[in-house]
Amino acid sequence: MPLQIFNTTKRTIDEALLAEAIQLVIGEEGGKVGSIEAIYCGNKMIRRINRDFLNHDYATDTITFGYNEGGEVEGEFYISLDVIESNARRFGVMFEDELLRVTIHSALHLMGYDDETPELRIAMSRREDLYLDRIRGASNH
């Protein structure tokens, strides 16, 4: 299975642009898309996943599970559109831009990037900015 995008909410999202972002990150980081599922959900689903798999009883913006074996990038990530919406307001950015950033962030996690320390967070944020600029330039967003 290649890249699949699932939107479990009633909110409309630009699935083609999100798929383009995921494929760009994976390709530019030296990977090949294997089986990747990107699931866009609400707080209820992501909180349950966070609790069941990570023992954190709260909603978060994204949770990524990488299953890379061999040459192809495989995994799944969940993004809460509810958290994206509240974070966009908090950071003073458009919903679409925050959604794109977190999608890129999740794809970077699939490629092995980590954000456990301040230094790693800064490095990851720089990669996010790079890909955001590339995608915005290509799609005129």
From Swiss-Prot:
EC number from the UniProt entry: 3.1.-.-
Main location: cytoplasm
Cited InterPro entries: MetalPrtase_cat_dom_sf_prd, YbeY, YbeY_CS
GO terms under cellular component: cytoplasm
Keywords on record: Cytoplasm, Endonuclease, Hydrolase, Metal-binding, Nuclease, Ribosome biogenesis, rRNA processing, Zinc
Free-text comment on the cofactor: Binds 1 zinc ion.
Record PROSITE patterns: UPF0054 (PS01306)
GO molecular function annotations of the record: metalloendopeptidase activity; RNA endonuclease activity; zinc ion binding
Residue stretches in coiled coil: none
Example GO BP: rRNA processing
Subcellular location per the Swiss-Prot or TrEMBL entry: Cytoplasm
Names of the cofactor(s): Zn(2+)
Residues the entry annotates as binding Zn(2+): H105, H109, D115
Family assignment from sequence similarity: Belongs to the endoribonuclease YbeY family.
NCBIfam families found in the cross-reference section: rRNA maturation RNase YbeY (TIGR00043)
UniProt cross-references to PANTHER family, sorted A to Z: ENDORIBONUCLEASE YBEY, CHLOROPLASTIC
The protein's role, per its UniProt record: Single strand-specific metallo-endoribonuclease involved in late-stage 70S ribosome quality control and in maturation of the 3' terminus of the 16S rRNA.
Protein name: Endoribonuclease YbeY
